[in-house]
Amino acid sequence: MDNPTDSAGKCPVAHGNTPRSRSNRDWWPDQLNVQILHHNSGRADPLGQAFDYAEEFKKLHLHGLKKDLHALMTDSQDWWPADFGHYGGLFIRMAWHSAGTYRITDGRGGAGQGQQRFAPLNSWPDNANLDKARRLLWPIKQKYGNRISWADLLILTGNVALESMGFKTFGFAGGRADVWEPEELFWGPEGTWLGDERYSGERELAEPLGAVQMGFIYVNPEGPNGNSDPLASARDIRETFARMAMNDEETVALIAGGHTFGKKHGAGEPFLIGPEPEGGAIEDQGLGWKSSFGTGVGKDAITAGLEVTWSQTPTKWSNYFFENLFAFEWELTTSPAGAKQWQAKNAEASIPDAYDASKRHLPTMLTSDLALRFDPTYEKISRHFLENPGEFADAFARAWFKLTHRDMGPKVRYLGPEVPAEDLIWQDVIPAVDHPLVDDKDIAELKEKVLATGLTVQELVSTAWASASTFRGSDKRGGANGARVRLAPQKDWDANQPAQLAKVLGVLESIQKDFNAAQTGAKKISLADLIVLAGAAGVEKAAAAGGNAVSVPFTPGRIDASEAQTDAHSFAALEPRIDGFRNYLNGKRHQFMKPEEALVDRAQLLTLTGPEMTALVGGLRVLKAGAPEHGVFTSRPETLTNDFFVNLLDMGTQWVPVAGKEGFYEGRDRKTGAAKWTGTRVDLIFGSHSQLRAFAEVYGQADAKGKFVNDFVAAWNKVMNADRFDLV
């Protein structure tokens, strides 16, 4: 008979002490993370692979939804009361913070996937109490179901909040499909909230980051690290907003426009706030930041610790932000929570209380607000808006639209009746097709003409890759459509081998001109299409040389963008510092990733899987699409074979570092010591990393020659069509 234990009568479930299995990254933290290529693969999608959000959105009664949202704005709930009887300020902040994580360096972040619902964003200090905003929306999301995604609903609610307070918005586009798991993204090196290890030197912010501290969307409203210096704050603001693709005028308009509404909350000390949603108890059901100060809500709410209301009419559009900014001199004070903020000197108490109509407060501002007055450039813009409120309203409307739609990609992806007709340069405009497209007979004829020019496989493939591989699945920018590879800045990028690119484009433009001139009707071939078609011809020629007859798919319909439709400054962010597919590394620019990390990062932006990335690298190497002296592990260059994998995995080769050239290696015959190959970290990672080696072994097998060619062609076609949203 078993003896009773001391735990008899206790709950058998372990609380808080269940052992956690260690992941491979725990054991080897520097291990290359290939798993990011397989996140949001669809297996976690409860709606299934057949679900078409665009079709569901078309069934949405947008007017009815907006009517319900308007009603919600003033339907104050006891569990989270509305400031001033209106949730507008809360919902503007929710939408702003959903979109505001966008960063132009890699196009990641933003509102496009509804990531604010998931960790870590749902628990960032700067997103405190936005969990309540989303819970207020749940009955409406529940009512309209799959016809409106969370990602779209968060932004639409921000628009309706503005409209309900008398502001005329620029428009709204739907089309943001939800994802169902957190995005694994580099938000910074810090291990603590509000840490700022991302800086070096004279406050140089590490790339690709945009925010100043871990857990902030933008800047610290109290000033850099709490230093209440408006000019220092202006420096942070300018850098941070530039990294999310905003210029000075847009920055001023956004800050002032957003701070026309609502208030900040700092009724009590920060230690009275409970854990964030991800750290909360199970019975809290995903609600965080529970406050033990007074009632914890309404007048007793604590969010950022600041207690600021900017306007005399915080639920109506006005010019009070600028009027107050310039009307008073300001003195530093502290909120009830101890946060540093500014109070108007010699002013009347003109600011309403959020919960007591009989009370009035002195005007208050944040350090980051005063930056708009004391920075000379911002001050000039701010005074102009003060004196021209109509221009301010238009600037804010446009900047808000840009903020909330920046990561949606080209206009063809926009859905709904409120899409503005005006084309905006940041949308990377591509004209509509206005002519008949080439048919199969034309395609065959054009391929023959391309191959008859004497252009090599390497030249054709390199040019097509340079055109298409700028695509970013993050913000849907780049890609072959538009043929912007022929325009500044892309035509001059070092990675694109400008001299060779100019030569190839000149030949292709001549073919295009002759073909179009020979047509009796309006049929045309765009240069954008011809670049991709020429690349396909090169791949087919290389495959045939290796004994594999393949037809690379080609669908015409790309069109050429003009220089006037291209924001060269904005496109500069797409220039590759490293392109592992081409074995390219720009030694003149700061690198913030190892070459192999940059390869996986680029593959993820191209929406490639691990096997697709592997097949493309192996094929591009033997086709000499990149640095000609490295990674070309074949005696048959410009022939599409699996030689890269066969020779990389050959145990007769010993790899040794090249003296004085970090990241470069020489492959020597293991017996004789004779040099055979040279390669980079990107090449050797396919033999070193266990998962990538497993992929490489599949393609290095004796029976894989045909499979490799077919897989390469499929992956190649995926990249060439990555920006063809008209085909989806």
From Swiss-Prot:
Keyword Metal-binding found: yes
Region listing for Disordered, in residue ranges: 1-26
Keywords of the record: Heme, Hydrogen peroxide, Iron, Metal-binding, Oxidoreductase, Peroxidase, Signal
Cofactor: heme b
Record site: Transition state stabilizer: R93
PROSITE patterns with a match to the protein in the record: PEROXIDASE_1, PEROXIDASE_2, PEROXIDASE_4
Free-text cofactor note: Binds 1 heme b (iron(II)-protoporphyrin IX) group per dimer.
Biological process according to GO: cellular response to hydrogen peroxide; hydrogen peroxide catabolic process
Transmembrane segments: none
Enzyme class: oxidoreductase
Post-translational modification: Formation of the three residue Trp-Tyr-Met cross-link is important for the catalase, but not the peroxidase activity of the enzyme.
Sequence positions that bind heme b: H259
The keyword Zinc is assigned to this record: no
EC number(s) recorded for this UniProt protein: 1.11.1.21
Protein family membership: Belongs to the peroxidase family. Peroxidase/catalase subfamily.
Quaternary context: Homodimer or homotetramer.
Its biological purpose: Bifunctional enzyme with both catalase and broad-spectrum peroxidase activity.
Name the record gives this protein: Catalase-peroxidase
Phylogenetic classification of the source organism: Bacteria, Pseudomonadati, Pseudomonadota, Alphaproteobacteria, Hyphomicrobiales
